[in-house]
Amino acid sequence: MKLNKLKARIIEKGMSVEMLADAIGKERSTLYRKLNNFEKITIGEAAKIKVALEMTDEDAIDIFLS
């Protein structure tokens, strides 16, 4: 997973981690742990993040499956 690209995408979309956490139904602290590689992002969470950040399929594949 390319966490730096994911973090850049969050900023690019003008969102904070708290805003993204709300959008995907997670606690902010949980999302912070996932973004700092202490916990894995699940497939379901990746799908919700993809929608919240308006990613194309190609962007999501590049970020989550690389």
Language model features by range: what are they?
Residues 20-21, 31:
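Append "Primarily bacterial transcriptional regulators
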